[in-house]
Amino acid sequence: AMATGIGKTRLMGACMYYLYKTKGYRHFFILAPGNTIYEKLRKESNPNHPKYIFKGLEAEMGRPKVYDGENYDSYPVRYEQMSLQFEKSSEIELFIFNIGKIFNSKTDSQFSFHKFKETLGMSFAEVLSSFDDLVICMDEAHRYYAPASMKAINFLKPVLGLEFTATPKSANNVIYAYDLARGAVEGYLKTPVV
């Protein structure tokens, strides 16, 4: 649990880097709760952005390939001879989506993310669930405990789920906590001027 403004997104990038270097994991699915945070994550996945998620780690890990709710149809995979054919790569691959792009709890409908694609022989969600190293990083994780959200997340069969939030639903799975008061005292937060 980390206070807002401390740097949860950069910590998320550091966790992905660590798992890439120590475990060889390459597939990371970043889940945002809504459009505002989704757009922020898309921007911060660009190396030219001042708050680049992997700032300082580029020399060690290269430039990750980024796919999101707008461009995932360009993911280099095809269905041939009864199996998926992936482009060979040793780079990290990020998949950035918001919960609304993968599942609509109001209508219980699945979006194109879950729909069968002839070129894949399955849905894109099934492609992701086929990775044996898929890690889900949940921004504002306290928002995903509803049954419909959990269903959408579990469908992807992640090897690991990392939750990033300022307001954890339960203290049982908090690995690290850094609160607002400590962030202010240690100078990591801007003091508001009135």
Model-assigned labels for residue ranges:
Residues A1-V194:
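RecA-like P-loop NTPase motor core of helicase/translocase proteins
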